[in-house]
């Protein structure tokens, strides 16, 4: 497995799958078929390669929901979610004429009794093993996981949602499987909208925060490499399309298999561009060496070249990809984003680069509105203006909506109220919404266009240092002694109304963001871990946010 995936959550999940799903089937020496649903396909893809499966005796991987040729002489491993659709598909494989010699069934988490009884009734004699392995989340990065539930946002925040409680219960169960996988063993005893009760002996502290805690971070133009890429470039399923010198197009996968990506992803774009001349020089030097070698190659030289060629070629490809991506990002930055960033930072921080308080946020916003920026960028700036004031007047709000020309799409702004974020500065909302107190970071060196620090970083640091305020963070259960007397913490702040080289053997902070997590917040988990060697921070959410994706989610809340 790759450098970035050899550690952290991905390695732990792959080890758990080997120790349960594969170990149970290893007693038989014959080769087996692995059958997956959509979720488990993504799960396995995130933590292993086909070569890893082959080495464990699995020769074929197939889709549970597609037509498959029977292979009656082979045994099949079914790895799937405990849903009616998956169970029905499994039963159909054995109901009439069995497709396989036997079935080893593994569910990602708890299988309801009615589904279990249905399987037992229809094909019990074909089932050799039936287990729940408690891995119902995706390990996206060494310290990042998701519940792979983009629909959760709508279910939780839509007014009068019919499936809010069911969605929250599902998320709670998924968090429990994470804790089980990490061997932190908290037991879920109670889950309400914004509290999470855990108990049991554990080395972890668990915090759950609501998206409304920090509406600013996912809206700002973030200028670190990974966050900037997913904001400005159309990257789908982590695939980045770039052009070669001959005009042809190629795709590159931006994940932890790419060591250069792991190295660069949390750097500021100014630092990344500082690396580009070196990368270009190395690529050019490689081409020159290749030309020289083509002219005077010996058998011994050819042998040496062949030995290092795969790794060498991979390194050169990675460098080419990141030269292209960095240039793409700088092109966007210089064309549009640079003009926005100063205004955005002043509105978010509440002060300018010299530390002078912004007395009239409208004067900061106005140049953005008058410039021919993209409508989405103007919406983002308007939101930052409103957030800075903790809501604005109805008259002012209507003027802003008209100025941005979104009278028929005002939900991009108005629907933030469904998250509990003040948009109109009514007395009741002002009393019910209290902003999280911020740490003073004025002594830290920052770029003028990157002065904002996500609220979550403050919370992570306070949790690690045992400084969370009891009045804001009601404790739910006893925390491990490793936290020096602190206790495991429940969740949302209660207002009224780069990958590490190894896993820490000490404490672990798990922070879950209900309603999506931004790339800038993901970066904070790595930074706090790096700064506190005795504690590893893992961050997770229902799904990963991009600014445009979040705005679309907000807009659809009243549809």
PLM segments and residue spans:
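Extended, well-folded catalytic/binding cores that form a central cleft or groove in large enzyme
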Residues: 1-559
